[in-house]
């Protein structure tokens, strides 16, 4: 059950080195390394392309059409955090724009992940403040109803607990549980190393058919070549 009207000020953040290190590996590699779990729904898209970030989650539960708690959340941000926001019911209003981004950026936030709408996207890009959202909308919000900050939330279908690691890029958004951050970093680095070896073989002209030993199972499945 959601707690409303609360702010947890002391949260256990994931290991900082692990949280920082996952950015370079990207969402797809991290998702695979975790066993293909942790992925937010694919409608969560960056408002502009080219950013690849990771950081520890400060979570926000919002009410439809009301961004009051985003201002409350700003106070809880520490350098290296990513704000993750969910809404109690579906809403695409523009909860976040350049003024809140200025506040978040001053506190050290690396990004915002919000299962709702944002606006001022041109200015946000000029500010180099990345956002992943499900909508872009000029429609503003009010400030009247309490939500909560730093409670477990479900954002775009994924449970996010305060302090978890968020990895986001052009391919999507992944949540890594804080307790698994170090383990997942090691697994993702190992996977990246293997992919580097495969990439070199493919670049040399080796076919995936041979590298992955696909020919025999394809033949057994009934594939026929016709000249």
Swiss-Prot record:
Conditions for induction: By growth on aromatic carboxylates such as phthalate, terephthalate, m-hydroxybenzoate and p-hydroxybenzoate.
One example GO MF annotation: (4S)-4-hydroxy-2-oxoglutarate aldolase activity
The keyword Metal-binding appears for this protein: yes
Keyword Membrane: no
Highest taxon of the lineage: Bacteria
Binding of substrate, residues: 97-100, 119
Cofactor binding note from Swiss-Prot or TrEMBL: Divalent metal cations. Probably Mg(2+).
Activity regulation text: Cleavage of 4-carboxy-4-hydroxy-2-oxoadipate, and to a lesser extent 4-hydroxy-4-methyl-2-oxoglutarate, is inhibited by lysine modification caused by diethyl pyrocarbonate. Decarboxylation of oxaloacetate is unaffected by diethyl pyrocarbonate. Inhibited by BeCl(2), CaCl(2), NiCl(2), BaCl(2), HgCl(2), SrSO(4), CrCl(3) and FeCl(3). Partially inhibited by p-chloromercuribenzoate and N-ethylmaleimide. Activated by inorganic phosphate, arsenate, phosphorous acid, acetyl phosphate, thiamine diphosphate, ADP, ATP and diphosphate.
pH-related activity note: Optimum pH varies depending on the substrate used and phosphate concentration. In the absence of inorganic phosphate pH optima are 6.6 for L-4-carboxy-4-hydroxy-2-oxoadipate, 8.0 for D-4-carboxy-4-hydroxy-2-oxoadipate, 6.7 and 8.0 for DL-4-carboxy-4-hydroxy-2-oxoadipate, 8.3 for DL-4-hydroxy-4-methyl-2-oxoglutarate, 9.3 for DL-4-hydroxy-2-oxoglutarate and 8.8 for oxaloacetate.
Job description of the protein: Catalyzes the last step of the bacterial protocatechuate 4,5-cleavage pathway. Has a broad substrate specificity and catalyzes the aldol cleavage of 4-hydroxy-4-methyl-2-oxoglutarate, 4-hydroxy-2-oxoglutarate and 4-carboxy-4-hydroxy-2-oxoadipate, and the decarboxylation of oxaloacetate. Preferentially cleaves the L-isomer of 4-carboxy-4-hydroxy-2-oxoadipate, and has lower activity towards 4-hydroxy-4-methyl-2-oxoglutarate and 4-Hydroxy-2-oxoglutarate. Does not cleave 4-hydroxy-2-oxovalerate, citrate, 4-hydroxy-2-oxobutyrate, 2-oxoglutarate or fructose-1,6-bisphosphate.
Family per similarity comment: Belongs to the LigK/PcmE family.
NCBIfam families: ligK_PcmE (TIGR02798), PRK09262.1 (NF006731)
Protein name: 4-hydroxy-4-methyl-2-oxoglutarate aldolase/4-carboxy-4-hydroxy-2-oxoadipate aldolase
The organism of origin for this protein: Pseudomonas straminea
């Amino acid at each position: 059950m959601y707690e409303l009207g609360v702010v947890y000020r002391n949260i256990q953040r994931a290991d900082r080195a692990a949280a920082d290190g996952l950015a370079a590996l990207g969402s797809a590699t991290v998702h695979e390394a975790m066993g293909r779990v942790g992925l937010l729904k694919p409608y969560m898209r960056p408002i502009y392309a080219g950013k690849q970030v990771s950081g520890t989650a400060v979570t926000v539960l919002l009410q439809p059409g009301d961004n009051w708690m985003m201002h409350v959340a700003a106070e809880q941000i520490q350098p290296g955090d990513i704000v993750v926001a969910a809404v109690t019911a579906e809403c695409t209003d523009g909860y976040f724009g350049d003024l809140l981004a200025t506040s978040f950026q001053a506190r050290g936030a690396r990004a915002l992940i919000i299962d709702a709408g944002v606006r001022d996207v041109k200015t946000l890009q000029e500010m180099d403040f990345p956002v992943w959202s499900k909508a872009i909308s000029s429609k503003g919000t009010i400030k009247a109803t309490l939500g909560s900050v730093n409670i477990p939330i479900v954002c775009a279908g994924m449970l996010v607990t305060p302090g978890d690691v968020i990895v986001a890029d052009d391919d999507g958004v992944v949540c890594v549980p804080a307790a698994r951050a170090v383990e997942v970093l090691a697994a993702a680095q190992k996977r990246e190393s293997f992919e580097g070896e495969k990439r070199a073989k493919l670049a040399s002209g080796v076919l995936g058919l041979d590298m992955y030993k696909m020919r025999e199972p394809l033949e057994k499945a009934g594939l026929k070549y016709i000249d």
